[in-house]
C-alpha cells in the first residue's frame, strides 16, 4: 500500500489505523491532541484510545476513551457511546477496578439494550454469556453466546463471528460438551490463522484459545496455537516473523542442569509494554512458558517466564502470575527450593493461588503437614472444575502424592478415584487427564502392594511418552521400577531406573536424579550389610554423597524428622556415632 499523500495529521492517523500501524497513528494523534484548538471527533478519539492501548499507554487509552464517550453523547450517538462504554468496562476490569467496570457495563447496557439489533450488542451478549457461565447457568450462557453469533452473522463481521464462535465454544466446554466445544474453537481459530481478522481480535482469540486449551487439558492444541501465537506476535507482528527470531524456534526437548549462571530466583519486574510492541506478546509468551515446562525445555521456560513478566501489560497481571508460577515449578523440580519459594510468592502477590506447586515444595522441604493443608484448601476453593479441568486434575494428582508421602492410603485412593472419574467424564477422552489419572491409580496400587499396579503405570508411561512430556514419564518409570522390583524382575527395574536417571540428569532434576542413582545402587544386592533396610541403605548412600538431612528429605520425599530417625537406626545397627563413620562404612561395604 502506498503512503498517504495528505498532510492532514488526523487523516494520516486514520489511514495508519486502517493499516493497523498503531505506533504511527498514536504519534500523529497524540501530537495533534496537544493543541486544544485542534479538536478531535468522537471517532478520532476512539482511534487515539485504540492506538494508545497498542502503544502500551493504558492510562492514556482510558482517558481518550472517556473523552470519546462524552463526544458520542454530545452527538446523541448511542451506538458509539454504548460501544465505548463497553470498552471502558473491559479496560477498567483489566486494571483491577471492578466498581468502575460495573458502572460502565451498566452504561453500555443503558445505551444499547433498547436499540434495534446492531453489531455493538454482540459485546453485551458476550458479557452476558460470561456472567451466566460463571454462575453455572450453562443454558443462559449458551443462549447469550448464540445470540452473539446471530448478530454477527446478520452484520457480516468476521471479527464478531469469530468471537461468537469462541464464546459458544467456552460455554460448551464448561458444560462438558467437549467435542462440540472444541469443534467451534477450531472454527474460530481457522479465521485467525487465515488472517481474516483485525489485530485486536486476532490477539484476543489467541489468548482465549490458549487459556481454553490448557484448562481443557488439550495439550496438542495448546502446543500448536502457542507456536502460532508467538509467530504472530513477533515484530512487526504482521503474521510473518523475521528470520532467526528465537521466539519462533521449535521448543527444545531438554535443558542443561541449573548452573551458577542461572539466576537464583525471579525478582519482580516492571510489567510495561515498550512503545510499538504488541501488547499480546507477553500474554502469549506466558502461555508458552507452561507448554515449554511440560515439554521439558526448562531453561527456556524459565527464561521465557522472565521475559513475559517484562512484556505483560498492566491490565493482564494474571499472565505474569502464571509465568512466575511456572518458573517456580521448574525451580522446585530442579531442587532450587528457595528460588521456587520466591517465584511462588510473586505469583501469589499477583493474585494466583500457587497450588499445587507450593504444597509439593513444602513436601520437598519436609513440611508434610503444610503440604496436606495447602492442597486440601486449594481443592476446597476449586469445587467446580468446569472452567479449569486441568487445574483440578493437577490438584488431585498432588493430593494423591502428598497423601502417599504421609502414608494416608485411604486419602490417596480417594483423590486418585476422583481424578480417574474426572478423566473418564471428559467427552472424547483427554490424553493428558488420562495420563495423570493412570499415574495416580498406579501409585496407589503400588503403595497398597496390589498386583495390579503395573497395568495403570504402563498406560501412564505410554500416555506421557505420546504427549512428549519427559519429566512425568520419568517419574512413572520410577514407580514402574518399584513395581518390577517387588515382582522380582530386577532387570526390568534397573532398565526403568537407568532411563529415568538419564532423563532427570538431562532436565536438571537433581533430587530425582539422586534418588534414581540411589535406587540403582541398591538393586544389585538382595541382602544388605549390617541388617540395614532398603530405605536405610538409601539414606546412608545420600549421607555418603554429602547430603544434609534437608537434602535427603527432599530427594526421598520424606520429612527431616524421618531422616533423623533413620540415621539413629543406622548408627545403632552399624555401631557408629557419626556421619563420617557411617560414610566410611558405606564405602567399605560397597554401598556407594
Please annotate each region the language model reported.
Residues 12-18, 43-56, 82-98, 120-137, ...:
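Tandem amphipathic alpha-helical repeat scaffolds
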Residues 1-8, 345-347, 386, 425-433, ...:
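TPR-adjacent "capping" and linker segments in tetratricopeptide-repeat scaffold/adaptor proteins
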Amino acid at each position: 500500500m502506498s503512503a498517504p499523500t495528505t498532510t492532514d495529521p488526523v487523516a494520516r492517523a486514520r489511514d495508519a489505523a486502517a493499516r493497523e500501524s498503531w505506533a504511527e497513528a498514536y504519534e500523529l494523534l497524540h501530537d495533534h491532541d496537544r493543541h486544544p484548538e485542534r479538536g478531535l471527533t468522537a471517532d478520532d478519539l476512539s482511534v487515539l484510545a485504540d492506538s494508545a492501548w497498542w502503544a502500551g499507554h493504558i492510562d492514556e487509552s482510558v482517558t481518550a476513551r472517556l473523552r470519546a464517550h462524552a463526544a458520542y453523547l454530545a452527538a446523541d450517538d448511542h451506538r458509539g457511546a454504548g460501544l465505548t462504554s463497553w470498552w471502558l468496562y473491559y479496560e477498567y476490569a483489566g486494571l483491577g477496578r471492578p466498581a468502575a467496570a460495573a458502572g460502565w457495563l451498566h452504561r453500555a447496557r443503558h445505551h444499547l439494550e433498547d436499540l434495534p439489533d446492531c453489531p455493538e450488542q454482540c459485546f453485551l451478549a458476550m458479557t452476558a454469556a460470561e456472567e451466566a457461565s460463571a454462575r453455572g447457568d450453562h443454558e443462559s450462557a449458551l443462549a447469550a453466546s448464540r445470540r452473539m453469533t446471530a448478530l454477527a452473522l446478520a452484520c457480516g463481521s468476521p471479527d464478531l463471528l469469530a468471537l461468537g464462535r469462541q464464546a459458544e465454544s467456552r460455554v460448551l466446554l464448561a458444560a462438558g460438551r467437549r467435542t462440540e466445544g472444541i469443534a467451534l474453537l477450531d472454527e474460530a481459530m481457522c479465521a485467525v490463522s487465515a488472517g481474516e481478522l483485525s489485530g485486536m481480535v486476532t490477539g484476543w482469540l489467541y489468548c482465549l484459545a490458549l487459556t481454553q486449551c490448557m484448562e481443557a487439558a488439550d495439550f496438542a492444541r495448546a502446543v500448536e496455537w502457542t507456536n502460532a501465537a508467538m509467530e504472530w506476535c513477533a515484530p512487526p507482528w504482521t503474521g510473518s516473523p523475521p528470520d532467526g527470531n528465537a521466539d519462533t524456534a521449535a521448543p527444545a526437548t531438554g535443558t542443561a542442569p541449573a548452573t551458577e549462571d542461572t539466576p537464583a530466583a525471579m525478582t519482580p519486574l516492571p510489567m510495561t509494554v515498550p512503545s510499538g510492541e504488541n501488547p499480546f506478546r507477553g500474554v502469549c509468551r506466558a502461555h508458552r512458558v507452561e507448554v515449554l515446562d511440560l515439554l521439558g525445555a526448562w531453561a527456556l521456560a524459565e527464561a521465557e517466564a522472565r521475559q513475559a513478566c517484562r512484556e505483560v501489560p498492566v491490565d493482564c497481571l494474571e499472565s505474569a502470575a502464571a509465568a512466575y508460577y511456572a518458573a517456580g515449578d521448574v525451580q522446585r523440580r530442579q531442587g532450587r527450593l528457595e528460588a521456587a519459594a520466591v517465584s511462588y510468592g510473586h505469583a501469589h502477590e499477583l493474585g494466583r493461588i500457587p497450588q499445587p506447586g507450593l504444597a509439593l515444595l513444602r513436601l520437598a522441604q519436609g513440611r508434610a503437614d503444610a503440604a496436606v493443608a495447602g492442597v486440601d484448601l486449594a481443592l476446597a476453593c476449586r469445587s467446580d472444575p468446569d472452567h479449569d479441568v486441568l487445574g483440578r486434575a493437577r490438584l488431585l494428582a498432588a493430593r494423591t502424592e502428598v497423601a502417599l508421602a504421609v502414608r494416608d492410603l485411604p486419602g490417596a485412593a480417594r483423590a486418585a478415584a476422583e481424578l480417574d472419574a474426572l478423566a473418564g467424564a471428559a467427552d472424547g477422552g483427554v490424553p493428558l487427564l488420562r495420563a495423570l489419572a493412570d499415574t495416580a491409580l498406579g501409585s496407589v496400587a503400588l503403595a497398597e502392594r496390589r498386583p495390579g499396579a503395573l497395568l495403570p503405570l504402563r498406560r501412564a508411561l505410554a500416555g506421557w511418552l505420546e504427549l512428549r512430556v519427559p519429566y512425568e514419564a520419568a517419574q512413572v518409570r520410577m514407580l514402574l521400577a518399584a513395581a518390577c522390583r517387588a515382582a522380582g524382575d530386577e532387570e526390568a527395574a534397573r532398565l526403568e531406573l537407568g532411563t529415568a536417571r538419564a532423563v532427570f540428569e538431562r532436565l536438571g532434576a537433581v533430587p530425582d536424579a539422586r534418588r534414581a542413582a540411589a535406587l540403582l545402587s541398591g538393586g544389585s544386592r538382595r541382602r544388605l550389610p549390617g541388617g540395614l533396610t532398603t530405605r536405610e541403605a538409601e539414606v546412608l548412600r545420600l549421607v555418603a554423597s554429602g547430603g544434609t538431612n534437608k537434602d535427603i528429605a527432599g530427594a526421598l520425599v520424606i520429612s527431616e524428622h524421618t531422616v533423623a530417625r533413620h540415621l539413629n537406626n543406622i548408627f545403632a545397627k552399624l555401631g557408629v556415632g557419626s556421619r563420617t563413620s557411617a560414610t566410611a562404612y558405606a564405602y567399605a561395604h560397597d554401598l556407594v
